[in-house]
C-alpha cells in the first residue's frame, strides 16, 4: 500500500508542474506576426518545418479556430475573436492543412503550442447566438446568453439592440474585453466546454500545449483548472503587465500550473534598459544579495515559469516595440533563465544567422530555464555568467564592454555590441556555428534527441567508449539513463548529459 501511495503521490506531483518543465532547455519560435497569413499560413510553415527544427523545439501558432471577420483562408483576420471552436478552418489554412503542419513538425521533434482564446467569443449572426460546439466523443455544448458575464457590454450598452440586458451569467472575474462577449468562467458548463475544446485540440489535431490569450480577463485559477483537465506539455499565459508582483500573483493563482510571458523583463531590461543604453535597468537584485537578469527571471521562485521575448505580434506594432539593437536583445534573453521565445520577423530577417548562432551556443552550454545567472557588470555595460548543464556561458552587451577574453574561455560569437564566451574545453568539443547543416544534440527529461540534417552516420557512446547506437537518420530520439554520453558524426563530436 505504501508503495502504491508513493507512486500516486509522485504522479500528482509531476502533474502539478508538468506545464512548466523543470530546468527546460526548450526554445520557442512565435511562428506568426500580425496579418502574416500569406507568409506563415499552415502550408508556408509546413515548407519551413525542417529549418525551424534546426533551432527550435517549440512553436507557438496563431489562433486556429474559425473567427469573426469571415475567416477566409489568406484573409486579414487574426482569429482573436473566435466564432466556432470546433471549426479549425481559418484564415491560416484548412483543418487538414493544420493537421499536416502539426504532423510535419512532430516528425522533426518540434512541439506545437496552440493560441487559446477563451476569455471571450463572437456570436454567429448576432451578439449572443453562439454556434454549437460539437467535439464528437469529447462532448457537445451549446453556449447561450446564460453563459455571458452579467457586466458584459451586452447589458451595459444600448447599442446591443434586442440583445440588450439578456446576459445572465455571473460578474466577470477579470477585466472586460469589449470586442466580443465575455464568457462566465465561474459556470461549470463553460468550464466543461473549454476543457472539451482543449482535449479535442490535443486528441484530434495533436497540439502539445497552450498559450492563453488575454489572461487579465478572468481569474488565473481557471487556467489551473483547464490545465489539470488537459495536462499540456507546456502552458503560458499572456498576463500583460510590466510589474513583477501582478505577474507573480497570476502564476500563483494558477496553482503554479502555468508559465507567463515575462513582460517585466521586456519592459525593464529591454525597452527601458538596453534600448536606452541604461544597463543598470537590465538587472534586479534577488533577495537583497545577488544581481540577476531583470524580470520574472531574476528570482528563483519564478524563472521556471517565465517565457522571455523581445517582441510579439502585438508589441511590435505600437509604442511597446523594442527599438534597440535586436541582436543584443537576443543575446540577453538567450543567456538568461526562462524559456526564450523568438519572434518570427526577427528570425526570418537579417538577424537570422546571429540568432541561430546564439541558440546553438545556449544549447552548447546547456543554459536552461532555471539556470543560475549572475550579473557581474551593470553600469557601463552588461555582463552575465549563466551556469548551464554543460558549462558557464559569459555574455557581454554594450559598446563599452571589454574585448579581452576571460581566462579559460574562448570567444565563440560576437556582433555589434554583444559577445559570447564558452569555456575553452567546451568550445573545443564542437565549433559553435550558425550552419544549417550542423549536428544538433539536445538532452532533456531522460531523452537524447539528435538532429542530423546531412544524414551522415552518427554514433552514440557512453563514457567508457561502448557503442550504444548507430544510425544515419536525420532525426532520432533515444530514451537513456541519466549519464554523460558522446555523440560522433564524422569530425563532429559532442558531449552531452542526459538528466
Describe the role of every protein-language-model region.
Residues 1-4, 499:
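Positively charged n-region of N-terminal signal peptides that target proteins for export
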Residues 8-18:
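Hydrophobic h-region of N-terminal signal peptides that target proteins for export
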Residues 20-34, 44-53, 63-65, 70-81, ...:
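Active-site-proximal helices and loops of the catalytic beta/alpha 8
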Residues 24-26, 67-103, 134-184:
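Aromatic- and acidic-residue-enriched carbohydrate-binding clefts of CAZyme catalytic domains
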Residues 93-126, 130-134:
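Substrate-binding cleft of carbohydrate-active enzyme catalytic domains
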Residues 125-148, 223-238:
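A short alpha/beta connector and helix-capping loop motif
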Residues 161, 185-197:
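Alpha-helical scaffold elements lining the catalytic groove of polysaccharide deacetylases
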Residues 430-499:
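C-terminal outer-membrane/trafficking sorting elements
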Amino acid at each position: 500500500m505504501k508503495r502504491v501511495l508513493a507512486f500516486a503521490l509522485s504522479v500528482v506531483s509531476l502533474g502539478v508542474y508538468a506545464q512548466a518543465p523543470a530546468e527546460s532547455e526548450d526554445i520557442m519560435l512565435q511562428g506568426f506576426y500580425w496579418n502574416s497569413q500569406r507568409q506563415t499560413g499552415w502550408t508556408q510553415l509546413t515548407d519551413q518545418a525542417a529549418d525551424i527544427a534546426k533551432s527550435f523545439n517549440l512553436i507557438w501558432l496563431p489562433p486556429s479556430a474559425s473567427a469573426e471577420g469571415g475567416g477566409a483562408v489568406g484573409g486579414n483576420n487574426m482569429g482573436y475573436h473566435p466564432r466556432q471552436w470546433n471549426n479549425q478552418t481559418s484564415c491560416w489554412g484548412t483543418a487538414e492543412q493544420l493537421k499536416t503542419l502539426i504532423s510535419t513538425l512532430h516528425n522533426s521533434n518540434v512541439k506545437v503550442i496552440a493560441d487559446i482564446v477563451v476569455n471571450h467569443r463572437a456570436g454567429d449572426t448576432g451578439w449572443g447566438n453562439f454556434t454549437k460546439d460539437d467535439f464528437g466523443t469529447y462532448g457537445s455544448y451549446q453556449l447561450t446568453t446564460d453563459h455571458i458575464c452579467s457586466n458584459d457590454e451586452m447589458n451595459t450598452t444600448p447599442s446591443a439592440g434586442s440583445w440588450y440586458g439578456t446576459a445572465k451569467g455571473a460578474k466577470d472575474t477579470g477585466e472586460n474585453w469589449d470586442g466580443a462577449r465575455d464568457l462566465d468562467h465561474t459556470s461549470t458548463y463553460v468550464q466543461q466546454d473549454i476543457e472539451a475544446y482543449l482535449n479535442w485540440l490535443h486528441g484530434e489535431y495533436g497540439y502539445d500545449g497552450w498559450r492563453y490569450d488575454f489572461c487579465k480577463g478572468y481569474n488565473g485559477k481557471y487556467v489551473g483548472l483547464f490545465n489539470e483537465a488537459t495536462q499540456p506539455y507546456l502552458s503560458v499565459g499572456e498576463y500583460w503587465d510590466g510589474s513583477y508582483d501582478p505577474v507573480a500573483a497570476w502564476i500563483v493563482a494558477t496553482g503554479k500550473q502555468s508559465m507567463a510571458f515575462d513582460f517585466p523583463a521586456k519592459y525593464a531590461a529591454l525597452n527601458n534598459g538596453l534600448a536606452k543604453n541604461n544597463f543598470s535597468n537590465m538587472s534586479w537584485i534577488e533577495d537583497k544579495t545577488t544581481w540577476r537578469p531583470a524580470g520574472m527571471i531574476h528570482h528563483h521562485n519564478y524563472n521556471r515559469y517565465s517565457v522571455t521575448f523581445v517582441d510579439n505580434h502585438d508589441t511590435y506594432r505600437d509604442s511597446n516595440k523594442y527599438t534597440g539593437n535586436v541582436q543584443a536583445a537576443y543575446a540577453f534573453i538567450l543567456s538568461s533563465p526562462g524559456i526564450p521565445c523568438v519572434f518570427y520577423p526577427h528570425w526570418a530577417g537579417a538577424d537570422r544567422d546571429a540568432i541561430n548562432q546564439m541558440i546553438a551556443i545556449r544549447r552548447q552550454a546547456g543554459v536552461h530555464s532555471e539556470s543560475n545567472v549572475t550579473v557581474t557588470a551593470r553600469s557601463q555595460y552588461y555582463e552575465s555568467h549563466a551556469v548551464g548543464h554543460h558549462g558557464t556561458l559569459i555574455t557581454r552587451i554594450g559598446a563599452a564592454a571589454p574585448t579581452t577574453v576571460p581566462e579559460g574561455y574562448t570567444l565563440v560569437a560576437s556582433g555589434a555590441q554583444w559577445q559570447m564566451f564558452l569555456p575553452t574545453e567546451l568550445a573545443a568539443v564542437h565549433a559553435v556555428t550558425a550552419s544549417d547543416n550542423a549536428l544538433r544534440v539536445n538532452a532533456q527529461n531522460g531523452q537524447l534527441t539528435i538532429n542530423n540534417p546531412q544524414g551522415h552516420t552518427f554514433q552514440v557512446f557512453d563514457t567508457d567508449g561502448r557503442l550504444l547506437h548507430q544510425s544515419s537518420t536525420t532525426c532520432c530520439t533515444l530514451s537513456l539513463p541519466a549519464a554523460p554520453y558522446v555523440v560522433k558524426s564524422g569530425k563532429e563530436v559532442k558531449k552531452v548529459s542526459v538528466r
